Amino acid sequence: MLDRFREGTWAFYRLGERSAFAELARTLIDAIPADDPTLALDLERLNAIKRARAEAAAEYFRENAARWHEIRSLHVPEQDVEAALLKLLPTCGIQDLLDLGTGTGRMLELLGPKVERALGIDLSREMLAVARANLERAGLRNCQVRQSDMYQLPLASASFDAVLVHQVLHYAEEPAEVLAEAARVLRPGGSLVIVDFARHDQETLRTEHAHRRLGFGDEEIAGWLFAAGMTPGPVVRLPGDPLTVNLWPAVRNAAADATNIAQAPVPALSTSGVT
């Protein structure tokens, strides 16, 4: 009934989405009275934990906004990631680009000159202040940034040709919801690229840098993409020491039926390396 994902010293559980018992589990949950006192206490505690995590992440961003590039460089050379991204993302013909969790706006600086319009979304005002300064310095008038929650984008459906999720998914409490929202704003045939860490056991990234997830597995990402109405492409891997950065590309299906897609088996993903 449950899927279990081990990450360092933590383990996450969620309802199995593809098992034969998934429907039974949902039925049992629906049968629990909404006013059950034990359930109410559990939900109250869960919300408190989520608030504490959000506050810790916000504080981390406030303390590190000015040296964000320096922190990222501790994990993997950014120039390697950027070179791989430029090879992977078909920037030619892109009118509207969305960068979720834009941070200092580096991805807008990189891709802005290659697209007609680009928008960066971030929840941190400190990060947005840095991004605005960087974009102004680069003279990128076609790029803008906006404060918004990546779970509830104030954007019309099917309004972007490409969406980038660069080193932000590991901060998300619900990565699948982030990808579903990214898919919603993508036009049919639009491109999505996720840049994040492969699964690892570097617990300090959770305890000292507010990472909610210690990387991701290919099948995990593929399942979320299919459920959101997207088709995954070959994974690009950039091995590092000790972390590996993966680039997971996907294309928005022309006529996505998320329910049917979510029930389809996830095929094995081919991979490629970039040196």
Predicted feature residues:
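Amphipathic alpha-helical dimerization/coiled-coil segments
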Residues: S19-R67
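Conserved alpha-helix/loop element of class I SAM-dependent methyltransferases that forms part
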Residues: H75-Q95
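Class I SAM-dependent methyltransferase SAM/SAH-binding core
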Residues: D96-Q152
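A short acidic, Gly/Pro-enriched loop at the edge of an enzyme's catalytic core
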Residues: Y151-A162
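A short SAM/SAH-binding and catalytic strip from SAM-dependent methyltransferases
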Residues: D161-E174
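A short glycine-rich, Lys/Arg-flanked "PGG" loop and its adjoining helix->strand segment in the class I
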Residues: A176-S191
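C-terminal alpha-helical "lid/dimerization" subdomain adjacent to the S-adenosyl-L-methionine
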Residues: S191-W248
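Core SAM-dependent methyltransferase catalytic element
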Residues: R237-T275
